[in-house]
């Protein structure tokens, strides 16, 4: 039951509006904007907020393409501005080169990605291929389950990214259309609470003609490796910071969506279903039905894909009889989704010996009915008893199209 006092705070708004409102109350200094479906509504709402004078001390920059959008934020962040943008799919791919520059210069840019399939063939619907393709660019990636979490994760990610021990950019990844265009009840972030939770951005190093420094300098073989090492160390420092920030957010706002991971019916689970994003809601509904029959099925939500929470995942599944990983992406050439590959990797040298299988699902926005989730669970139960026969496969292929 939702507390009546809490219910009174809830409003029914579009996901994109809620995210734009969250970005607004984080008090950005520079917003760069280029429209691309299904992200467009986010920057449209921010444009309206700017026109209405609701975002003080902020510059809204209309650019001609996504490469310029991220480039504008690189310059702004380097001089000490809190920056924000939003993109998706081909726009995120166009940013690819500059994503490395952003993270390599240790600029804590924060961006919302309304996850969408990539071309070709052209597809505007949801999967995670766009962000997964950027997993090695040095950005943090936090995947959200619903609109409320998409709102609440933005100030958390700013706080993590802008920590002077970390200084790494980050993406809040929300499922395009499924979350960006849905209308559902949310509590919009309050300005006073957000001001208390998220302090102003105060970087130790900025571009300043009075105190000249170099960003993105030329690095020879004598120094380049140390840059990469320090970047990786910052990511490792982000692991406990993500956990601590989620708990601090709960203390201020009363809401908790998980830290690096989150469990549902997990403590005694014999079969564990792992996933990221909005599909978790469907999975939980199916698991509830299994639990009603007395079957010990649980859900492991992976919230942080970068940095990857190896220790937390190993601990979460150590007592399981079998694990199934659902991926809304495919790493072409491996016949595996990225979360499945990462999960196997972190278990390999651990003391946890549990069979893991994977399914790639929902490509290009294909519907994922509860019957398909139930089928996956039934197959995983067979693995727990008899072992793995097929390690990873596509789900719900239409044979008549092959």
UniProtKB/Swiss-Prot annotation:
| Record field: catalytic activity | 2 oxidized [2Fe-2S]-[ferredoxin] + pyruvate + CoA = 2 reduced [2Fe-2S]-[ferredoxin] + acetyl-CoA + CO2 + H(+)
Question: Matching InterPro entries, A to Z?
Answer: PFOR_II, Pyruvate:ferred/Flavod_OxRd, Pyruvate_synthase_PorA, Pyrv_Fd/Flavodoxin_OxRdtase_N, THDP-binding, Transketo_C/PFOR_II
* Enzyme class, first EC level, given as a word: oxidoreductase
Keywords assigned by UniProt, alphabetized: Oxidoreductase
Domain of life the protein comes from: Archaea
**SUPFAM superfamilies xrefs:** Thiamin diphosphate-binding fold (THDP-binding), TK C-terminal domain-like
Gene Ontology MF, one: pyruvate synthase activity
Q: Is Oxidoreductase one of the keywords UniProt gives this record?
A: yes
Protein EC: 1.2.7.1
The record's section on Gene3D superfamilies has: 3.40.50.920, 3.40.50.970
BP term (GO), one = response to oxidative stress
The yes or no answer to whether the keyword Oxidoreductase is present is: yes
Subunit structure of this chain's protein: Heterotetramer of one alpha, one beta, one delta and one gamma chain.
Q: What's the further remark here?
A: It also catalyzes the oxidation of 2-oxobutyrate.
Per its record, how is this protein called by name? Answer: Pyruvate synthase subunit PorA
What species is this protein from? Methanosarcina barkeri (strain Fusaro / DSM 804)
């Amino acid at each position: 039951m939702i507390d009546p006092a809490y219910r009174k705070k809830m409003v029914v708004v579009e996901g994109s509006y809620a995210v734009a409102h969250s970005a607004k109350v984080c008090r950005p200094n520079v917003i760069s904007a280029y429209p691309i479906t299904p992200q467009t509504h986010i920057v449209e709402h921010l444009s309206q907020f700017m026109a209405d004078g609701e975002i003080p001390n902020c510059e809204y920059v209309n650019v001609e393409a996504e490469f310029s959008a991220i480039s504008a934020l690189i310059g702004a962040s380097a001089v000490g501005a809190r920056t924000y943008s939003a993109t998706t799919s081909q726009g995120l791919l166009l940013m690819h080169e500059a994503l490395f520059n952003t993270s390599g210069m240790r600029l804590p840019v924060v961006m919302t990605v309304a996850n969408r399939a990539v071309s070709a063939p052209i597809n505007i619907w949801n999967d995670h291929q766009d962000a997964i393709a950027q997993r090695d660019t040095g950005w943090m990636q936090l995947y959200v389950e619903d609109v409320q979490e998409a709102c609440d994760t933005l100030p958390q990610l700013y706080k993590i990214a802008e920590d002077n021990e970390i200084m790494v950019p980050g993406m809040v990844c929300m499922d395009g259309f499924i979350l960006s265009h849905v209308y559902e009840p949310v509590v919009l972030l309050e300005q006073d609470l957000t001001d208390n939770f998220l302090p102003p951005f105060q970087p130790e190093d900025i571009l300043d003609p009075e105190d000249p420094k170099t960003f993105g300098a030329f690095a020879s073989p004598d120094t380049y490796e140390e840059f990469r090492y320090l970047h990786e160390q910052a990511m490792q420092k982000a692991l406990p910071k993500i956990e601590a920030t989620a708990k601090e957010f709960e203390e201020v706002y009363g809401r908790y969506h998980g830290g690096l991971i989150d469990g549902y019916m997990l403590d005694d689970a014999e079969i564990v279903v792992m996933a990221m994003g909005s599909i978790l809601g469907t999975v939980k509904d199916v698991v509830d039905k299994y639990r009603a029959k007395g079957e010990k099925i649980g859900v492991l939500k992976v919230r942080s894909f970068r940095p990857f929470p190896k220790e937390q995942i190993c601990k979460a599944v150590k007592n399981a009889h079998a694990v199934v990983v659902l991926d809304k992406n495919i790493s072409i050439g491996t016949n595996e989704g990225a979360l499945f590959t990462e999960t196997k990797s972190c278990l390999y040298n651990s003391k946890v010996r549990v069979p893991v299988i994977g399914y790639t699902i929902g490509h290009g926005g294909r519907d994922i009915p509860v019957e398909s989730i139930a089928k996956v669970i039934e197959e995983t139960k067979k693995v727990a008893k008899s072992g793995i026969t097929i390690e990873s496969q596509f789900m719900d292929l239409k044979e008549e199209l092959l």
